[in-house]
């Protein structure tokens, strides 16, 4: 099935609406559409042909957006690359690319190049790499249909305002950040793009210019609240995802007048799967034997579907009678201690409610007697104190005895990815 290029449609329907705003540039849809055509001509002049991959090793901002839409206009496949990766990591992501863009596109153009004004929904648009929190990062080929259905599902779940201003401070090589650019183009609304996450800058943006949506991981929300975010005037929702969300954090946000929506998603499902509990209208959920979350629907990348048609997420969860999903953790993270299964997220949620704790991560370590012992790695709030005995007692009043950590480690910070997601595999045994 063919659909009109969403950027071309946005430029036709709302030429003067702001497509992108960054610290260095403001582009209307007419301007971004023209820039995408020039970028496509320049890519063609470099020898890039439809169906070939183009690595985008560019900072977040106008140059990235122009190159991204230039790839789509030419019919090439964009491959965003995180600039913070080591050279060897970048090489893995770019080895199959016909071109690597590490500077804004300039130079010769090929005005005779055939341009794509319509998209085949089954064609691959962008290859996004997973964050690699539990294993090596994997490439996921997302189609135009994946992006379109993801945008439609999100709009139904959140509502859509023509004056939407969606703030992105996530890396554009991450599906959560990239989806803001893609959805904004599909909706013909505004993407407000920050090059990196600076808590004070985001607070000022939310307090001043009035973004209506912002996407964050839990660590980012903590830092925004620490930086003084209170009652942002235009914010409809802070979408919080990318890892388990402690109820205490959502309560803290509510007390500060910050509306939050807990989300669950993954790269293979083109970002969002659930928003505020229920699945997107176009997405089906199932809990397999053992508790693994299975996902199906048009947002799931074709290459991520198992022979049974489902995406096996590797995440643990439960569905209530109304179809609301609660994510418990990762299948691989489950701790088996004394023959009992313990989900780290359950223990983390209890510890996160302790007033002295800023962040906590729980994992299992080999133990001759128990098989695995539960270890809690704790970051205390500034000027706060707590002892292992105190925290064990706190857990003992709220959890079954076998779920109480046997070891508490106090550290200045937790190991995380560039996007702020916990690297559980890097926790010390």
Regions found by a protein language model. Give the residues of each.
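Conserved AMP-binding/adenylate-forming core of the ANL superfamily
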Residues: 3, 8, 18-47, 52-55, ...
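Conserved pre-ATP/AMP-binding loop-to-beta segment of ANL
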Residues: 16, 112-129, 136, 145, ...
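Short beta-strand->loop structural element characteristic of the AMP-binding/adenylate-forming
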Residues: 55-57, 64, 68, 72-100, ...
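Gly/Ser/Thr-rich phosphate-binding loop
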Residues: 208-216, 220-221, 225-276, 284
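Conserved ATP/PPi-binding loop(s) of AMP-dependent carboxylate-activating enzymes
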Residues: 259, 279-282, 286-313, 318, ...
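Conserved AMP-binding/adenylation subdomain of ANL enzymes
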Residues: 148-165, 173-213, 227
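AMP-binding/adenylate-forming catalytic core of the ANL superfamily
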Residues: 297, 316-403, 413, 420-422, ...
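Conserved AMP-binding A3 loop
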Residues: 28-30, 125-152
